[in-house]
Amino acid sequence: MMENLLIPPPPWTGRMDGTSSHHLRWHQAVTPLQDGVEPGACVFIGFSSDEGVERNKGRRGASRGPDALRSALSSMALAEPLRAYDAGTVAVTDNRLEAGQEALGAVVAATLDAGQFPVVLGGGHEVAFGTYLGLAQASVRTPGKRIGILNLDAHFDLRSDPVPSSGTPFRQILEREHAAGTTLQYSVLGISQPSNTTALFDTARGYDVRYLLDDECSVSDRHRVAVFVSEFLSDVDLVYLTIDLDVLPAAVAPGVSAPAAYGVPAETIQFVCDAIAASGKLAVVDVAELNPSFDIDNRTARTAARFIHRIVTKRIPIVR
């Protein structure tokens, strides 16, 4: 029997300028998820985990990421009303990462089956395997539907470690697909060559992973990035977008386990998020690796919240 690791959502609080739609902020729009919610809403799902990062020899602290993201998003202004809910947080304790990933998968699948848009707040990048499990189990994945994962990340996360970690999720996913006789397209934007060994590049080639290096994603490279995203979208029917915040420069995102010496500009990441959200193919998104312990002036959380805000407001219909 699957463990119930879901804890209730915290209250969303923030600045209050008024109660009309002209004064609306996120904390006024988000309510706890209830049974019987109509399709078409955004549902936030937290994934509180340090276990995968620790197994990958990283810095602990990502377990506090979900609440930091909620806090950063709370006071952002909404231009139009929309329906948004919080399902709570899957909390990984006592080294039970695999149980946590299964529990997250169950929540994501239920959210998709209810016709909602899941937004998963990590947590280390081990969150990715749980998010994928949800998409793989959901009814939206019908035979013949082509699945694509676009990872905005400095790392391939294709390690072959003996135990699952934040460095292994996409190898786990690709191996699971192969065992099931199915396939998906895995693409990565923002790869840092010095942060990935030759063995990892060889693994990526073996799995036919498409990627752009971080130094190919500057603002002046907009056309190259646009072509990369367009080709990705043309080959898939359903998209899982995953944002590892260490893809950003350290000055923008200091609050991660492995800050980037170079990184991809926020302008490029926002451009990609906008394109994916507007494609009509985005099924689920997650944000990973926020570590509030190292987040100077909440820079990383605020930047991540901006991306979430853009994605959701482009993906979810407004309420008239």
Curated annotation (Swiss-Prot):
Q: In which pathway does it act?
A: Amino-acid degradation; L-histidine degradation into L-glutamate; L-glutamate from N-formimidoyl-L-glutamate (hydrolase route): step 1/1
Please share the entry's free-text remark on the cofactor. Binds 2 manganese ions per subunit.
The processes (GO biological process) annotated in the record are:
L-histidine catabolic process to glutamate and formamide; L-histidine catabolic process to glutamate and formate; putrescine biosynthetic process from arginine, via agmatine
Cofactor(s) for this protein? Mn(2+)
Q: Does the keyword Acetylation apply?
A: no
Give the E.C. number(s): 3.5.3.8
Binding positions for Mn(2+) 2? 153, 155, 244, 246
Example of a GO MF term: formimidoylglutamase activity
Report which superkingdom the organism of origin falls in: Bacteria
Positions that bind Mn(2+) 1 = 125, 153, 157, 244
Q: What PROSITE patterns does the annotation carry?
A: ARGINASE_1, ARGINASE_2
Q: What class of enzyme is it?
A: hydrolase
Q: Which InterPro entries match?
A: HutG, Ureohydrolase, Ureohydrolase_dom_sf, Ureohydrolase_Mn_BS
Question: What keyword terms does UniProt attach to this protein?
Answer: Histidine metabolism, Hydrolase, Manganese, Metal-binding
Catalytic activity of the protein: N-formimidoyl-L-glutamate + H2O = formamide + L-glutamate
Q: What does this protein do?
A: Catalyzes the conversion of N-formimidoyl-L-glutamate to L-glutamate and formamide.
Family statement drawn from the similarity comment of this UniProt entry: Belongs to the arginase family.
Protein name, entry field: Formimidoylglutamase
Biological source species: Rhodococcus opacus (strain B4)
Gene name on record? hutG
